[in-house]
Structures are given as C-alpha cells and as structure tokens.
Amino acid sequence: MEGPRSDVGRWGRSPWQPTTPSPEPEPEPEPDRSSRSRRGGGRSFWARCCGCCSCGNRADDDWGPEPSGSRSRGTSSRGGGSRGGDSRGRDSRGGRRPESRGSGVNAAGDGTIREGMLVVNGVDLLCSRSDQNRREHHTDEFEYDELILRRGQPFHIILFLNREYESSDRIALELLIGNNPEVGKGTHVIIPVGKGGSGGWKAQVTKTNGHNLTLRVHTSPNAIIGKFQFTVRTRSEAGEFQLPFDPRNEIYILFNPWCPEDIVYVDHEDWRQEYVLNESGRIYYGTEAQIGERTWNYGQFDHGVLDACLYILDRRGMPYGGRGDPVSVSRVVSAMVNSLDDNGVLIGNWTGDYSRGTNPSAWVGSVEILLSYLRTGYSVPYGQCWVFAGVTTTVLRCLGLATRTVTNFNSAHDTDTSLTMDIYFDENMKPLEHLNHDSVWNFHVWNDCWMKRPDLPSGFDGWQVVDATPQETSSGIFCCGPCSVESIKNGLVYMKYDTPFIFAEVNSDKVYWQRQDDGSFKIVYVEEKAIGTLIVTKAINSNMREDITHIYKHPEGSEAERKAVEKAAAHGSKPNVYATRDSAEDVAMQVEAQDAVMGQDLTVSVVLTNRGSSRRTVKLHLYLCVTYYTGVSGPTFKETKKEVVLAPGASDTVAMPVAYKEYKPHLVDQGAMLLNVSGHVKESGQVLAKQHTFRLRTPDLSLTLLGAAVVGQECEVQIVFKNPLPITLTNVVFRLEGSGLQRPKVLNVGDIGGNETVTLRQTFVPVRPGPRQLIASLDSPQLSQVHGVIQVDVAPSSGGRGFSEAVGDSRSGENIPMAFRGGA
C-alpha cells in the first residue's frame, strides 16, 4: 500500500476522493527458520555449562510452516519413548523437528557410557494439561502438550536414571534460548540440583523412588520469556553425562501475574481471571450516544497462537536479553502488530476498499490473523483500530500480561503536538480545510496492560496504555506506549512513552480559531468537554460495559482537570493558547439524532436555549455529510439555514429530516454521519460551533445451538439473518470462530435478496469443556458490521476426558448453500 498518510478515511489532511482499488500488499521476505548447527566441546563439565561452549542446537526458530489442518504436538520423553504417537518428529506448529541426537555424551564427547556413570534415560516434565505443573501455573487451557510455565513459580519434573541417585552425584539442569546462549545474558540458565542458583533459579530433590528422581525446580521471577531448550548434565566418579536435546522437552516460560516478585504481578484474582485467562471479550464502537458492542475471540490458548506471539518478537529481532522486561516487550508488540516499518502482523486500511483482503469489520477474533502470520510470514490485510487492539490483547495475554481492550469515544488525533484540537475558520466561519490537520475519531480502541514501571519515578505503576494502531511515529517507528495512565490523568506529558499524544486523545480541548482582518487567528470558541467524553472496557466477570473515564482524567470541568489540561498544554507547541480566550456565552446549543437502523429514514435536531435575560437572534447553519469513524468526512449532501429568535429563558428546535434515499449513495464504513453546526448571535457576537457524529445501527446475527455440546462430539449451530436493506447483498461471507469450539472458518454464501431472511447451519466439535463463546460475522460490499454470538456450555466427554484432540474444521472459502430462505 501507499504510505499511511495517503489513506482516505484515516488522515484528516487527506482530501476526499473516490475510492480506488488497493494495490496488492508487497510481499515480505520469508523469515529465516533454519536450525543452527550443533556445537560441541571436550572441556570439563562445568566449563561446558557456559553458553559459549555447551553443545546442542541453540536456535529458538527450528520450525517450518504449519501444514493445513496439522495438529501434531510434541510430548515429554520417557526412556526414549514417546507419548505423542503421530506427533513424533514434528514441532509444536506442525513443522519438521530436528531428530534427537541419540545417546548421551560423556566428558570426552565420544558417546561412550562407562559403568557407574549416572545416566539420564529420560525425563518426564509432567506437562500434560491435567498434570500438576500446568494446573498450578494456570496454563492448562493452552492447546499444547509441551510444558508451559509462568516465571517465579516452582514446578516438578521426574528424571529416569540408570541407577539409584547417590549423595556424591552431581546433577545440573540447563535451559537455553536463542542462537548464542550466554549465562551473563540470561539466555543460558544453569540450575545445580541441591544448590541455590543465581537470580532465583534453584532445584531440590523432593522424592527418590528406585531409579526415579523427582525434582522441584524454581524459576526466576525475572526470567526471559520464550521457548527454552532443556537438557540435563550429570557428574559422578565414573564420568560426566549429558542428556541429548529432545525437542519434545522444550519449555515455554511466560510472565506471571500470580507471582508477587514478578513486576507484572496483579493482586486481584478476579482481575487475573478476566485480563489473563478470559479468551473472549467485548469491544465497543460507534458514538458515545449510540454505543455498539461486538464480541471478540482473543483465543490466546488456541494451538499455534503462543508460537505466533513469540514469532512476533523474533521477527522484530528483539534481543533475548530484553525479553524479560514487560515494558520492552509491550513496546515491541505495539510496533509489530501493525505492518509499517517492520512487516508486522496487520496491514492497516482506511480507504473503504478491501477487495484484496478482509474488511476489518468482518474479523471475529485474533486466531485466524495470528495463525496466518505465523504460517506465511506475510502481513495480513486488513485492520483498523479495534482489530489492532484485539490482536494486541491476544498477544499480551498469551505472554502473561494482564491486558484489556479499551475504547475512547471522541478520541482526538493531535498532529502538531499542540495538545489541543485546533479547527480553523475564515472570517465568515467557513472551515479552512488546508489548515485543519487535527481530527477527532468517533471512537478509538487501544489497550491497557498492568505492570510496574521501574524506569519511571514512583507512583506510575499499574495500568499502562499500549496502542498498536499506526497513527504517529515514536522514536522513528509506528508504535505507542507503554504510557502510564497516571501520567495521562495529571497532564505529566514529559513521562515516557508517548504521553503527549495519548493525553491529547483523551483530554485535549477543542479550540475554534477565526481568521481576523489582519490575517491573524483568534480563539472564538473552546469546547472543554468534547474530547475523551467516555472511556470504557468490558467489566470483570460480566458482559456489561465498565466506565473507566475516571482513571484517565479528573472530573470534567473540575479544578484538577483544568490544571492537568493547562499543565499539558504548557509543554505543547502552543503553550500560550489560553491567553487569547474571550468568553461571553448565554445561548446554549444541543444536538440530538434519532436512533435509526440502516435503511430507515431519520431526523437530526438542534436545540437552542437562551440562558440570558435579553432577547437573542441566532443565525444557524446545519450541513450533513457522511464520515469515517476516524473523523475524515465526505462532501456535504444536505444542508439547512435558519434564523431563530429566542426570548429570555426560551428554547427552540431546528429539525432536519433525512430520507434513506438521500444518504444511501454516500454511506461509508460504520454507517456514520457528521452534522456540522455553526451559528452567530446577532446581539452579543457569540459564536456557536458544534460537530455531532451519529451512526446507523446494523442488525445482529441470531445464533441458536441445536442440541447439547460435549467435548469430542459433533454439535450444530443455526444462524439466522434478515437483510434490513431493500437491495440485494452480493458476495456474502460468514465467519465463525470460538476458542475451544471452532477453528476460524470462512463461509461463502452468495447473494441475499432485499429484506430476505436466511438460515444457515454449521457443525463443530468442541475440544475443551466449560463456558465458551461462538462468534459469527457477516460481510458484503453493501453491508458490514453485522455480528452475533452465543454462549456454549460444553460438558466433558462421557469418558471423563476434559480435552479432546478433535479440532473444528478450519476450511476457508467454503461455498455453503442456505438451509432456508424466506421473505421479509
């Protein structure tokens, strides 16, 4: 695509122009996925435990593309055997794994096993979903068979030895990550059994049973996150032994919000359940007065998603030594979820033409997007703010950070760091479009993640804003955050990262400037409550909406809020902006829009009230246009002029009826319209100015479960949709997705006639028990933003198995006939 500022519908400075087809996304270089060659050495046991000389494959990227439909997984080895059956020889993403390296090695490196040596025949990492480790680490929902741990928390393993363990024997566990593991960088961890390791790493023997040895291993709360290779070394009087690396024994380590020593620690269990473990959520959109909500499948535990999240860090080239720092990790994620600069996950598109990809409104979750990126290495078309935010929530929750998706209504986009939203008019109050670069988005979606901020002074821990939507550059790249919400609330815009930009999004003033006869500009009106009018997120343990505006800003109009705004503006590019303000206002104006469904007629109204003691005459001008949710509007398609006389204390209403046939030819994404109102009070010279955005609602999909849902057993869902428009919807596409229920599925259903009702039935096989969300969407060139969701309570299988290896069909582009078609 062209540079980001060329996107119609996104950048306020871009002129309105007809939609043109998007060019094919540029192909990206295929990532290097080759395994590194093995290194060896013949030095002493402890010398060979350092990163520069221990042998073995040190690569963290020994994987290939996942074959379509592949679900193979590795398992722990026991005496060289496999519990994985058909997973042997493949890595966790379905790609070919390197073979195990045969017998263990002795000090000479020749593979000779001498009598009396302590040989490790195998290791059981107790890594199945029902085992103690996965349950205690809250990773049992991951659809992986490898051991997945949260740092700073102990786990247990069993070593299978060739003889009984003796007090003179020495055992060391090793964890290695990256291409050149080094002890000093934390990428090569040595854990001597029975001795305290460095940085919180240690291991103790908890049980001996013949030749079996049970160990309790403690990981560091500051450990690097990622996928580690695991091996064991022993030393006895007869010699030294190293267990060969087995890819089935790879260990994933994640951040741990359950660990008080981890800087991502969250001291509320209900928060952890919601912001770390919940696999679905609500994302809010629309306008403050007409809030829409959509369910999003985060799917952070789906098979392949964890590998996709780690691949994002690899693709950025993030140094392994920095991967233990949540500040650095979240900042990299904010850069990599968008494709600009670094060929990240999603290509942004605000043009309205999505013919070469997927309409951002059609996505129902993150899984399809992340697995496509992992499988191909290419950026996925297309995303807008809620898609970037939904994927970011998935990535950060998957890696162990408590994260939520946040919507800010009337979100400012400050392009000149003035920390005000500036709108310029000529002498007749006609907008000067060539100067109006700032814009106000109807809504904007970003993320909050919870962590301490050791890089900032005290008092700035807690929620941090991370925004992956590419709007402005930070340190030369398109990323944003993490930024302390506390610094935003108090106008401390000098705190890193990107506080000025985010402050302007939530608490800047909307300043109207009028050109004077001498060419200078004067402030004629200030809207102090127009920006960041409502900030919301999904409530904990509920599908209700939670208002979190108060954590971002002091009460609107309060002394503390005004001080925060003026303090922030003093650090902006127009520090004296408030010095020229005039105030003489006794006529109030309020805009109201009828709540209407797309396809219906509607009415918008302006209510004027004279709060003074004298008669007032108001000349009013209303003009209506369609608008993208980013605040970029099209040409006016209807306008009204009227003069209103108001007695003291009186009110009057100016109404503008709008028929479907009037707005239909002009509609763009989100079905939003913008009413611009400007006016002038003859007697006092007061200037009236208001921009009011409203949207047309779209219908929902109705989902019904036909029968009970049981793990491993096929069940059926019925989807019903009624076309609200009198025109035919062409090339209609349904999407289905639900963690533990249905892998991402795309269904092509053809055309749907005007006002027609259609019924679609689909089968799926649940793979995990418990309450689940099955989410669907409908998209066509004529109608988008149509969604539906149903909760599915999945029972365990009759055999008592909590999980199933069955996988919902993930076919894409399947042509599906309708089960039933009916009239209006």
From Swiss-Prot:
Which biological process terms from the Gene Ontology are attached to this UniProt entry? Answer: animal organ morphogenesis; keratinization; keratinocyte differentiation; positive regulation of cell cycle; positive regulation of keratinocyte proliferation
Q: What UniProt keywords apply to this chain's record, in alphabetical order?
A: Acyltransferase, Calcium, Keratinization, Lipoprotein, Membrane, Metal-binding, Palmitate, Phosphoprotein, Transferase
- Highest taxon of the source? Eukaryota
Q: Which residues cross the membrane?
A: none
**Positions where Phosphothreonine occurs in the chain:** 20
> Which PANTHER family does this chain map to?
PROTEIN-GLUTAMINE GAMMA-GLUTAMYLTRANSFERASE, PROTEIN-GLUTAMINE GAMMA-GLUTAMYLTRANSFERASE K
Q: What is this protein called?
A: Protein-glutamine gamma-glutamyltransferase K
Classification from the root reads:
Eukaryota, Metazoa, Chordata, Craniata, Vertebrata
Instruction: Report which gene this protein is encoded by.
Output: Tgm1
